[in-house]
């Protein structure tokens, strides 16, 4: 007999919705648990089977914590701004808002069909003006605190499309759409000063319960380096340039300098004879992405400016070159080259026949650069010193001479925040007719995104909003001056930087969230999502959160106390699921054929939650068979409760497996080891099928432990057991440590180390009692008759070995 998943799931989903079963409780005196999923971008493709893996994990924890008496916050929403909707709108002429709403409705239906215990009254959508009012408000605060500024930044400009492209839209120097040439062009952009928080973003990682691999990725992205800034004068010019180096001790080995093609001094210092060559090189460089420019495998290119820098430590003339492997966005946009001890500088020097001067003993620099340690040579005052001594001495000298200073730098760049797009949050800035700019007053927020059919690029590099004159041109309500609205919009990251705060108080129109509620719910106890957000989303969120902490909006320094990355569900052929490969599994199909509980159970039983595992239809069938077996254990052929389930004090047959199951399942759910927790539920079911009598309390508690994984079946069985209330708030079972110990244990009796007999004895038997039992055993007595006992070895709980001759 099998249960009808379609009927059961529909019945309980309606019950939960009508009764608002999962409305967040905020009872005083209860502990809190905030379980958060990385909310999805509602794409046109709908949910795939990878989404429910993480969602089921947080749902199991949320359901268990409710039963353990916690106030649980378990919300869901939509990260709904972004490029795909705008692209769709451009291609079809449809409104991205309508497209997005349609996709959200699909996602919501699919997620509800999986029985997740979300509080749908807290649903948020980043494209809702009630939500993005507060995204804009945070921007105004960043601006007021000097953390949002306008800068000239090199962007990917596509003349044919008349728009700026994101890095991921450029492939091999051409636009992904249409294959048009793309070039690098400096444009005024909004930038957020995340670098002001670099040190704290780095240091506070140590306090977080996150996978070490993710913390390491963030550390590398922030990229802290200690070294010195050194100033180089330019022969025949008043100007100078600064380089940052982690190895100021190698300054004596510098033989040339390199500027990025975009460096502001290039035009000034290039000599007339080199002008044509330099201009041709600059034109070539602007067609390449940063990634292409810094590729170590590519051949080094460059051009000489004809100008010379002066080495501050020895007065030597260093030719100044331009090369595209130096980026203006990284460091100071200029480097001192020490080819004897740096592989990239060495290759460049060999290509252009530049001098190579060894200043650290070791290696063979006629063959390759020597990057190892050694004594300093050819280095004047540093000769004979090791690396640490020489770095320290050189920095002291530079500071004393006014030629440089000790410096800590970060690989982390300030965050390029503006997008030349329509489908994003408008940036709340007014450009006044007197040339000044200011934030829009809070009373005027939100600045609504205007509805328009015209979302094609402006052609000027501004966003399509620049085309809407009646929206752009306005009056500043405070000064009465004419003003132009900022036409750039925010990136998709903006809305996801703080959404977890809005879930705490989603309908507040007076503040981002009530401070008392933020105090009650933060930090997030568990955050589960894919590792693809390891760096940017998590780093940006931490940055905004720290800023909000500094201005007194949030009570914690960090948003996410514990983070867990679920693995990827691959296609049956072990390849990543994708439409093009035709191996995508649609959850709607599985819910129809096998049921939502089966899908949840299977995804949790596939293997460790953080492993990437191939989808298996056999495994799915196995999960369904187990749930049918559970149903038959509780429900007879007549549809009534199994007669073996009774109120009884005779629990001997099931007692130990019951306490073992409660202990293991509780600990495994807490530790996100759902696959081994399910294995223990299977052990319980196997024992239950063998038992003559099934104590009702044990069976009820089994249903409680099953229900976080298979909630629809859990509710159905709970009702069959005679309950009129949902199982969702039934008290989570507890175990007795004393009942986990086996009363009896099987031991082996050996003669001269060979197994001869097995014996059941009391588990607390002493060595002496074990020896006595062995000697009195009939079979053993027969086998040792007439022999001399040399010694008897007893190992409690395991064996007795009688040595005879």
Curated annotation (Swiss-Prot):
Cellular component GO terms, alphabetical: cytosol
Pfam families: Anticodon_1, tRNA-synt_1, tRNA-synt_1_2, tRNA-synt_1g
Domain of life: Bacteria
SUPFAM superfamilies: Anticodon-binding domain of a subclass of class I aminoacyl-tRNA synthetases, Nucleotidylyl transferase, ValRS/IleRS/LeuRS editing domain
Location relative to the cell: Cytoplasm
EC number(s) recorded for this UniProt protein: 6.1.1.4
Catalytic activity: tRNA(Leu) + L-leucine + ATP = L-leucyl-tRNA(Leu) + AMP + diphosphate
Record key words, sorted: Aminoacyl-tRNA synthetase, ATP-binding, Cytoplasm, Ligase, Nucleotide-binding, Protein biosynthesis
GO molecular function per UniProt: aminoacyl-tRNA deacylase activity; ATP binding; leucine-tRNA ligase activity
Motif 'KMSKS' region location, chain numbering: 576-580
InterPro entries to which the protein is assigned, alphabetical: aa-tRNA-synth_I_CS, aa-tRNA-synth_Ia, Leu-tRNA-ligase, Leu_tRNA-synth_edit, M/V/L/I-tRNA-synth_anticd-bd, Methionyl/Leucyl_tRNA_Synth, Rossmann-like_a/b/a_fold, tRNAsynth_Ia_anticodon-bd
Binding site for ATP: 579
Single biological process term from Gene Ontology: leucyl-tRNA aminoacylation
CDD domains found in the cross-reference section: Anticodon_Ia_Leu_BEm (cd07958), LeuRS_core (cd00812)
Chain positions of motif 'HIGH' region: 40-51
Keyword Cytoplasm appears in the UniProt entry: yes
PANTHER family membership: LEUCINE--TRNA LIGASE, MITOCHONDRIAL, LEUCYL-TRNA SYNTHETASE
Family: Belongs to the class-I aminoacyl-tRNA synthetase family.
Record-given protein name: Leucine--tRNA ligase
Top-level taxonomy: Bacteria, Bacillati, Bacillota, Bacilli, Bacillales
């Amino acid at each position: 007999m099998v249960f009808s998943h379609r009927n059961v799931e529909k019945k309980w989903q309606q019950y939960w919705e009508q009764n608002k079963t999962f409305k967040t409780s905020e009872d005083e005196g209860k502990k809190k648990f905030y379980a958060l999923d990385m909310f999805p971008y509602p794409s046109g493709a709908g949910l795939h089977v990878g989404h429910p893996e993480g969602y089921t994990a947080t749902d199991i924890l949320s359901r268990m914590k409710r039963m353990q008496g916690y106030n649980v916050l378990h919300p869901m929403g939509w990260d709904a701004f972004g490029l795909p909707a705008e692209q769709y709108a451009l291609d079809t002429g449809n409104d991205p808002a309508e497209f997005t709403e349609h996709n959200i409705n699909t996602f919501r239906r699919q997620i509800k069909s999986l029985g997740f215990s979300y509080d749908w009254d807290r649903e948020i959508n980043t494209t809702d003006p009630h939500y993005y009012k507060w995204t804009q408000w945070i921007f105004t605060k960043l601006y007021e605190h000097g953390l949002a500024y306008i800068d000239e930044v090199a962007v990917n400009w596509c003349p044919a499309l008349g728009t700026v492209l994101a890095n991921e839209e450029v492939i091999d120097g051409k636009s992904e759409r249409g294959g048009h040439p793309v070039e690098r062009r400096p444009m005024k952009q909004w930038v957020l000063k995340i670098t002001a928080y670099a040190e704290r973003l780095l240091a506070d990682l140590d306090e977080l319960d996150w996978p070490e691999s993710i913390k390491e990725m963030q550390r590398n992205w922030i990229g802290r380096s200690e070294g010195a800034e050194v100033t180089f004068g330019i022969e025949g010019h008043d100007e100078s340039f600064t380089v940052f180096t982690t190895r100021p001790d190698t300054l004596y080995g510098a033989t040339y300098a390199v500027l990025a093609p975009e460096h502001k001094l290039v035009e000034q210092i290039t000599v007339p004879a080199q002008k044509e060559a330099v201009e041709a090189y600059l034109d070539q460089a602007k067609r390449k992405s940063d990634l292409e420019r810094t590729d170590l495998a590519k051949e080094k290119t460059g051009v000489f400016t004809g100008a010379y820098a002066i080495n501050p430590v020895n007065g030597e003339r260093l030719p100044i070159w331009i090369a595209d492997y130096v980026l203006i966005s990284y460091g100071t946009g200029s480097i001192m080259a020490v080819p004897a001890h740096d592989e990239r500088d060495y290759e460049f020097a060999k290509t252009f026949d530049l001098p190579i001067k060894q200043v650290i003993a070791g290696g063979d620099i006629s063959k390759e650069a020597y990057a190892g340690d050694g004594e300093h040579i050819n280095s004047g005052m540093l000769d004979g010193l090791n690396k640490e001594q020489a770095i320290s001495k050189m920095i002291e000298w530079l500071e004393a001479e006014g030629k440089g200073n000790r410096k800590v730098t970060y690989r982390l760049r300030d965050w390029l925040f503006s997008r030349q797009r329509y489908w994003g949050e408008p940036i709340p800035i007014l450009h006044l007719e007197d040339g000044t700019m200011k934030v829009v007053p809070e009373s005027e927020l939100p600045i609504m995104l205007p509805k328009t059919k015209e979302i094609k690029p402006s052609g000027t590099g501004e966003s399509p909003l620049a085309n809407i004159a009646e929206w752009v041109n306005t009056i500043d309500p405070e000064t009465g001056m004419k003003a132009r609205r900022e036409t750039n919009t925010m990136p998709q990251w903006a809305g996801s930087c703080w959404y977890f705060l809005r879930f705490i108080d989603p309908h507040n129109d007076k503040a981002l969230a009530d401070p008392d509620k933020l105090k009650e719910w933060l930090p997030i106890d568990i955050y589960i999502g894919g590792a693809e957000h390891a760096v940017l989303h998590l780093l940006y969120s931490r940055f905004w959160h720290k800023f909000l902490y500094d201005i007194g909006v949030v009570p914690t320094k960090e948003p996410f106390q514990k983070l867990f990355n679920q693995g990827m569900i691959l296609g049956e052929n072990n390849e990543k699921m994708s439409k093009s490969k035709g191996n995508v599994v649609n959850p709607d199909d599985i819910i129809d054929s096998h049921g939502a509980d089966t899908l949840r159970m299977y995804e949790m039983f596939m293997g460790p939650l953080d492993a990437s595992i191939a989808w298996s239809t056999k495994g799915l069938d196995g999960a369904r068979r187990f749930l049918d077996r559970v149903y038959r254990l509780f429900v007879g052929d007549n549809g009534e409760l199994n007669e073996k389930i009774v109120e009884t004090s005779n629990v001997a047959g099931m007692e130990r497996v019951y306490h073992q199951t409660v202990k293991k399942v509780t600990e495994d759910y807490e530790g996100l080891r759902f696959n081994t927790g399910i294995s223990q539920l299977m052990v319980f079911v196997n024992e239950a099928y063998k038992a003559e009598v099934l104590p009702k309390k044990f069976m009820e508690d089994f249903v409680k432990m099953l229900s976080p994984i298979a909630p629809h079946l859990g509710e159905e069985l709970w009702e069959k057991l005679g309950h009129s209330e949902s199982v969702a708030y039934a008290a989570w079972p507890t175990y007795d440590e004393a009942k986990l110990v086996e009363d009896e244990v099987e031991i082996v009796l050996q003669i001269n180390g060979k197994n001869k007999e097995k014996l059941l004895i009391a588990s607390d038997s002493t060595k002496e009692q074990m020896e006595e039992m062995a000697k009195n055993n009939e079979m053993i007595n027969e086998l040792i008759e007439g022999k001399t006992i040399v010694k008897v070895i007893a190992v409690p709980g395991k064996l007795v070995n009688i040595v005879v001759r």
